[in-house]
């Protein structure tokens, strides 16, 4: 049976976020090294604050890396090879936070249970 729904337009993606998860007691040093390498190799990326306390839907300490669409094809493979055992969630920014963090997400490493109920849902037009 063929699905008659229109395909989603990738042009709605405004950019991407990568959330790098770490444990403050045991893996923050690796997260710091990764962060420094991202800053050096991808100056177009914007590094967010360190969040040792839980924030939003995230079940573990993390920092965010925001990056433009043009960087996706380079930064994602780089993270695959250089994440040093850290878990990374990569998702698009379409305006639908719930779906971006769930159905549209790519996980590198262990998939963590997000608290999706705190995210805004935006119906697709």
Regions found by a protein language model. Give the residues of each.
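Long, contiguous binding/interaction regions
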Residues: 1-125
